[in-house]
């Protein structure tokens, strides 16, 4: 299995878990059983068009990946680049405009924004929406609120997919990205831990358990001004690891970790599910979706972790064929794998430029259907 297959698996697994858990988000467990049977939801609950819909969690994850590649392209072509998280505001605000005005700015900042499903109004995070409406993002130095919510977590996924050599950088970038909308240290540090888990699995080909050990070791030496919060998160992660090998029933294990509305709880539930079903993405996502809490986020985390571990080629077709935006997600995943193929002195690449410089790729592609794909992309 190559890195491309693992990155594809991570992004499709994330979206698939989100789509599986979305119809049962916040439903009581009794209601889930009443609607879907004793096993709960085990397959997509399709919309009227036969599509498994993603939510704002996946939408913002994709926009974050788009933002990283935009930043890298700017750095490659201009030789200078601001901190990566500082490029996200335009992508998030453009997405927010569609949520509130039904139309985005004339100058879209991300090529995926041309696809209506990338900004359809579904399972919006109240915390993020309040921040977007204020037109002012937070930072680790100036928190914008005191939210510990899990709405920041999936934005960490592309960070783990994009970086591998510097754990401290990954932790810091993911924490700064979370701090844009969530002001509590527990949200920041949970996002950092999640990004690092992703990186270890994808780039080092570690098992999920091995990735957890390395992540805990890195956490123990990070955020020295926030050790109380770090240790709180580490206890939650260790509880998930312990429960994964226990005789506890699925629901009892999940209940002991929380409902998933708080970042550390969502991460722990997703991790628990992935550890119990490391080679079975259907089992992991089903486990993580069938509880009376933040089902789409916990199932997305589980799907991402197992998808990264087993790769796209091992994900059952039933979770791919009907998934909303599947072709866009795969194309973006391949771009994450390739990263910017240009430099300020090398040849141009029209496909890449229209994605990550001009940001008009969908329009340009319609006018240039025969344009060649990126020659630097691994196939």
Outline where the language-model segments fall.
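Structured, active/binding-site neighborhoods that engage oxygen-rich ligands
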Residues: 1-379
């Amino acid at each position: 299995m190559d890195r491309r297959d693992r990155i594809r698996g991570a992004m499709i697994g994330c979206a698939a878990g989100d789509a599986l858990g979305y119809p049962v988000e916040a439903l009581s467990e009794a209601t889930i059983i009443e609607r879907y049977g004793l096993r709960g939801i085990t397959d997509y609950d399709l919309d009227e068009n036969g599509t498994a819909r993603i939510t704002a969690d996946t939408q913002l994850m994709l926009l974050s990946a788009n933002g990283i590649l935009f930043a890298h392209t700017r750095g490659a072509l201009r030789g200078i680049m601001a901190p990566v998280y500082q490029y996200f505001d335009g992508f998030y605000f453009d997405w927010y405009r569609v949520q509130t005005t039904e139309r985005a700015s004339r100058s879209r900042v991300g090529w995926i924004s041309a696809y209506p499903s990338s900004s359809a109004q579904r399972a919006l995070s109240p915390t993020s929406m309040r921040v977007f409406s204020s037109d002012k993002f937070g930072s680790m130095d100036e928190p914008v609120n005191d939210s510990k919510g899990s709405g920041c977590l999936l934005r960490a996924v592309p960070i783990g997919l994009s970086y591998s050599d510097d754990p401290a950088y990954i932790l810091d970038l993911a924490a700064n990205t979370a701090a844009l909308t969530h002001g509590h240290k527990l949200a920041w540090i949970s996002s950092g831990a999640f990004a690092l888990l992703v990186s270890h699995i994808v780039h080092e080909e570690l098992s999920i358990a091995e990735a957890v050990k390395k992540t805990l070791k890195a956490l123990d030496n990070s955020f020295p001004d926030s050790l109380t919060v770090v240790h709180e998160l580490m206890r939650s992660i260790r509880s998930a690891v312990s429960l994964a090998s226990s005789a506890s029933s699925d629901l009892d294990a999940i209940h002991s970790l929380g409902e998933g509305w708080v970042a550390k709880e969502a991460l722990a539930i997703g991790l628990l599910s992935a550890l119990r079903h490391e080679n079975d993405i259907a089992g992991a996502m089903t486990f993580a979706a069938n509880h009376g809490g933040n089902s789409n986020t916990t199932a997305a985390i589980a799907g991402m972790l197992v998808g990264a571990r087993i790769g796209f080629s091992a994900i059952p077709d039933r979770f791919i064929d009907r998934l909303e935006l599947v072709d866009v997600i795969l194309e973006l995943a391949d771009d994450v794998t390739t990263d910017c193929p240009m430099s300020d002195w090398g040849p141009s690449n029209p496909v890449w430029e229209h994605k990550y410089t001009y940001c008009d790729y969908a329009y340009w592609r319609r006018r240039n259907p025969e344009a060649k794909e990126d020659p630097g992309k691994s196939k």
